Regions:
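A general structural motif
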Residues: 29-31, 60-62, 140, 189-191
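Active-site neighborhood of divalent metal-dependent phosphoester bond hydrolases
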Residues: 43-135
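Short, glycine/acidic-enriched loop or turn micro-motifs at the edges of active sites
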Residues: 10-11, 42, 71-72, 149, ...
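Divalent metal-coordination and catalytic microenvironments
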Residues: 8, 39, 68-69, 97, ...
Length: 249
């Protein structure tokens, strides 16, 4: 099977579609699927178009959805926080995503926050897309996840491998979605190459390959390849790019 892997689109549908076109996803006549490594929305302004695209791929059984930390934030916004416009929901872009998907007026959303939350719960994103998301997906040689697989973070900022990560509970997966895979991979001992997103790849190129800076003119947002890891988050809001990895396995 051929897999087209994309991560952290964050609502930049046009850039995502361009990356898929360049990789040959739409013209591919062989068996293939799209793998989305989470963080679908919360930056760009094309949430509705992207939502429709995902629903179409789901209907055709051509997409595998991995849950990211921003999906967790959306659920938190519309359930625990009842649609309240807390500052971190705004700074993370989650509040704006809910506004886009519901069509709510920003002023009315802040006043009628319970109605706003109910409207967000009635979106296909909340009712259909998020419930279809997996913590991870694996093939013979690869495991696909958002941040990293559940591990034990140590005080020195290293990570200790957990052999039973597949049996991890909800809390462990929620935590792992926030991990920087490029740091976690330095101590991981898994037999599969882990393909992840969440953290901008310029970090790995800069810190571990000593190539360019994280956010300067010389920053490299291409996929990062290291022992046991392929990281693909291009930090689209900053770079304007979306990485598309093509894997056959």
């Amino acid at each position: 099977m051929r897999y087209y892997v994309i991560s952290d689109v964050h609502g930049y549908y046009t850039q995502m579609k361009s990356a898929l076109e360049k990789a040959g996803f739409f013209s591919d006549t062989t068996p293939h699927k799209l793998i989305m490594l989470g963080d679908l929305f919360d930056r760009g302004h094309e949430a509705k178009q992207f939502q429709q695209f995902i629903l179409e791929q789901m209907e055709q059984d051509k997409i595998i959805l991995i849950r990211g930390n921003h999906e967790d934030l959306f659920v938190e916004l519309v359930t625990t926080d009842a649609g309240m416009p807390y500052s971190y929901h705004k700074s993370n872009g989650t509040y704006d995503t809910a506004l886009q998907l519901t069509g709510f007026d920003p002023v009315m959303a802040s006043i009628r926050h319970y109605d706003f939350a109910d409207a967000a719960k009635d979106t296909p994103f909340y009712k259909e897309i998020i419930p279809a998301m997996l913590d991870y997906f694996e093939t013979e040689h690869y495991a696909f996840t958002h941040g990293w697989i559940p591990s034990i973070p140590n005080r020195d900022k290293s990570y200790s491998y957990i052999s039973s990560w597949r049996e991890a509970d909800r809390e462990q997966w929620n935590q792992a979605r926030w991990f920087n895979g490029m740091d976690a991979a330095q101590t991981a001992d898994e037999n599969k190459t882990i393909v992840c997103g969440h953290w901008h790849t310029s970090y790995g190129h800069s810190k571990y390959e000593h190539k360019g800076s994280e956010f300067g003119e010389d920053a490299d947002f291409s996929p990062y390849y290291g022992p046991g890891i392929i990281a693909i988050d291009a930090c689209t809001a900053f770079s304007g790019k979306v990485n598309c990895l093509v894997i056959e396995d």
